[in-house]
Design a protein with these regions (language model features):
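A short glycine-rich, Lys/Arg-flanked "PGG" loop and its adjoining helix->strand segment in the class I
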Residues: 10-25
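A short SAM/SAH-binding and catalytic strip from SAM-dependent methyltransferases
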Residues: 1-10
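Residues that cap or flank secondary-structure elements
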Residues: 4, 51-52
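Short "lid" loop at the C-terminus of a central beta-strand within the Rossmann-like core
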Residues: 26, 31-36, 76-81
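Conserved Class I S-adenosyl-L-methionine
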Residues: 73-138
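A short alpha-helix capping/helix-coil boundary motif
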Residues: 7, 38-42, 110-111
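Short alpha-helix
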Residues: 52-74
Length: 138
């Protein structure tokens, strides 16, 4: 599950648990801090409102434990994979701008495309990680 749909991983766990058979495996996809930003300003430059928006990887695994789950598998994005994920968004914005130059949102999309690559390589690339975690309730 994508945890933002339920206000975070605890909310997503609660929703997903309703559909899980006993002994079933829950998959949670969640960003985490690879390294905690030194300031709130850097966190905001990463595109979040606060350093408290995400946990570190040890903090996230500990939070799953606190919710009563064993982590039985995890697949973490490496930086190259994350780079490709982010860059695909830039290409999508560029193609959208080419196809929709007169759209009301074109100026906003152009402004985002102008800053997104530099912001990513300056701030988010070193700070963000992302993983999918396989969990089984105890």
């Amino acid at each position: 599950g994508a945890t933002w749909i339920a206000g975070g991983f605890a909310g997503a766990e609660e929703l997903l648990a309703q559909s899980l058979k006993p002994g079933g495996i829950m998959l949670i996809g969640e960003p985490y801090w690879r390294q905690l930003p030194a300031t709130e300003e850097i966190a905001q430059a990463c595109g979040v409102s606060s350093t408290s928006d995400f946990l570190t990887l040890p903090g996230l695994v500990g939070a799953f434990d606190d919710l009563g789950y064993d982590v039985v598998e995890m697949v973490l994005a490496d930086q190259e994979g994350w780079d490709r994920y982010e860059a695909a968004k830039w290409l999508t914005m560029r193609r959208w701008l080419e196809a929709n130059p007169d759209d009301d949102f074109a100026a906003d999309v152009r402004a985002e495309l102008n800053i997104a690559p530099k912001r990513y390589v300056t701030y988010a690339r070193e700070c963000f990680g992302w993983g999918v975690f396989a969990l089984i309730a105890r």
